[in-house]
Amino acid sequence: MVREGEERIGNRVLLGVIGVSYRETTLQQREQVLHILQQAQGSFRPEVFQEERDYVLLATCHRVELYSVAPAELFDSLAQEIKLLGVSPYFYRNQDCFAHLFCVAGGLDSLVLGETEIQGQVKRAYLQAAREQKLSFALHFLFQKALKEGKVFRAKGGAPYAAITIPILVDQELRRRQIDKKASLLFIGYSEINRSVAYHLRRQGFSCITFCSRQQLPTLSMRQVVREELCFQDPYRVVFLGSLELQYALPHSLWESIWDIPDRIVFDFAVPRALPSHTVFPHRYMDMDQISDWLREHRKEVNSAHLDSLREVAYRYWNSLNQRLERHDCVGANA
């Protein structure tokens, strides 16, 4: 159902996205922007909708974005606050917002060109927002169509094959450090990035893999330990941190012991980082900044024809949305 006031999109109220990505920012800056956007969510209250909130927050390893139907002044205010960090955020409105999310969902705006993980991340961000709020029709329409067309784009072979990925980087790093394939590996968090790395390493012959999550996962074929039973004194040779807000999920006393095993390696995939930078041993630790640098060196350039193809699809959906809103406006005027 189209909500009253949505016919104003493109005038005083905009459908827009503001954010930063790996292109403009370091990991630390993305963490700071994430904090700003989290604090600002309560400000996205377009009076014309008479709703408390109307936004979708997309936070991944390489991007932090907030999508909303809101007055332009709110986007401007956020942009000014982010600029105080020394960062220039991008802001796309209306049809350009459509084009941006379609390219994001299709893997064409990713550091790992053509990656599939972003599709799931976009879907989870949308579903979480839909559970917590009464989203506007425009946001439902935007995310549903972007997810649909991202999937279609991949199925047709439009998305390039991601030959250089985070699992491949991890595999190469373990080989460089001569980590034995019988070594014990611990994955904290059942995130998609942790799963992709774990299954890749198992295919490469690593056999002692343990997952730690909030609760037992009945379908998981690997060893498991619940968080309450986690102990860093156990001889885990490599630890992978891949859960959101992980820094606060475990007691401080437990984190203090993560370096007690000599030569233990830690991969921190979390954003914000699970381990503050001043607490780590640099030669035994990799965060998303270091991983991003490696990926950037090996990144393929996006095919402009692929970009144009997805953008054209996005523009058609934007026009379709406007036609629906105009029809609703006409019906309301004649009622």
Curated annotation (Swiss-Prot):
EC annotation?
1.2.1.70
What keyword terms does UniProt attach to this protein? Answer: NADP, Oxidoreductase, Porphyrin biosynthesis
Domain of life of the organism encoding this protein: Bacteria
Q: In which pathway does it act?
A: Porphyrin-containing compound metabolism; protoporphyrin-IX biosynthesis; 5-aminolevulinate from L-glutamyl-tRNA(Glu): step 1/2
* Top-level class of the enzyme under EC nomenclature: oxidoreductase
GO MF terms on file?
A: glutamyl-tRNA reductase activity; NADP binding
One of its Pfam families is GlutR_N
Residues reported in the UniProt entry to bind NADP(+): G189, Y190, S191, E192, I193, N194
Site-annotated residues for Important for activity: H100
Q: Does the record bear Lyase in its keywords? A: no
Which residues are listed for substrate binding in this entry?
Answer: T60, C61, H62, R63, S110, E115, T116, E117, Q121
Catalytic center residues: C61
Q: Which GO terms describe its biological process?
A: protoporphyrinogen IX biosynthetic process
- Annotated domain remarks: Possesses an unusual extended V-shaped dimeric structure with each monomer consisting of three distinct domains arranged along a curved 'spinal' alpha-helix. The N-terminal catalytic domain specifically recognizes the glutamate moiety of the substrate. The second domain is the NADPH-binding domain, and the third C-terminal domain is responsible for dimerization.
Comment field (misc): During catalysis, the active site Cys acts as a nucleophile attacking the alpha-carbonyl group of tRNA-bound glutamate with the formation of a thioester intermediate between enzyme and glutamate, and the concomitant release of tRNA(Glu). The thioester intermediate is finally reduced by direct hydride transfer from NADPH, to form the product GSA.
Tell me how this protein assembles: Homodimer.
Q: Which family does it belong to?
A: Belongs to the glutamyl-tRNA reductase family.
User: This protein is called what?
Assistant: Glutamyl-tRNA reductase
Name of the gene this protein is made from:
hemA
